[in-house]
Amino acid sequence: MKKELVTAGFALLSLTVPLKASAADFSQFVVFGDSLSDTGNLFNVTQGLPTGPLPPDPPYFQGRFSNDKIWVDYLGDNLGLPPTTITDLIVQLRTTAPEGVNYAFGGSLSGQGNFLNVPGVPGVLEQVGSFTQPFLTNNQKVDPNGLYAVWGGANDYLFTQNPDVTQTVKNVSDSVGLLAQAGAKNILVFNLPDLGKTPLVSATGNTNAFTTLTNNHNAALAAALGQLSNTPGVNIIPVDVDSLFNRVLANPSEFGFTNVTAPCVVGDLVQGVLTSVCNNPNDFLFFDSVHPSSSAHKLVADTALASIRAKSVPERSTALSLLALGVGAAAMLQRKQKNLALTPVASQVVSKHSSRAVVER
């Protein structure tokens, strides 16, 4: 456990205080997003498609848009909080999951709906709205001790006509704002990697236009998060995926990649027509034309964890003990978060439930 030496001006008093990363003791892990965060929701709801479920397994891994685990899995494993997909909860007729819930769907737009036109697949803001609405309506709060994550916007730029940066960023920031309004305290928010460097865009020759879109999105998102960070008691944790991918693109070998320009999988994912799959996907930055390989996702998870730890705080019990010893200044850190309330997000299947899931530790 990380240690921090705390002194408070007393000549004879110095204490070694345990400073836990916020990651070390959250109650639950709740995720909202698109295919970059989906661990099986779209796969579950597209079982009846003539071309088969999306994404096809193999070569995609168990409903993930990659060759193996994605950042949600890696971070969830690190926290000891692997979230359950909302669609699995619905099938199992469960209303809660002790470690958290993943509401992300492949194809989701930042606001409402999805670019795949799959009925019932919600956008990111829609996911968050469905989750928070029962609490806000009943003047209740979600459990403040969970870790919440929001990542969206890429599909708006890659797969819609006339993408609007202002509206897309508003959708993402409104999602964060709703969570904060409902009582969430720790919220991870991811920016976008340079979409102009994806194999999909590179093949069209529109690299500069999409790089500009990405830069504008990330700048506007940073400004919006800066405003939201002024909300009392809310810990906004930005995750800079853009800088991470730029470092990888500049020095591939440093991160273990041999190919950062071509996709491992070639073909049309939506149509279910895949023409070739490489033998060494984790040597590639991109598994397909837009989605990262599992190795790249591991880097995203590591970056998210580092971002969380950069805002580490001691638990309230530690702060109180320091106050009792007269070390007032050392106790001005926030409490770590523990338990999260879970409410349903899809098809109103479990919308009538608003019970809270509490983890006993």
Cite the ranges covered by each PLM segment.
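Conserved active-site regions of diverse hydrolases
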Residues: 21-314, 361
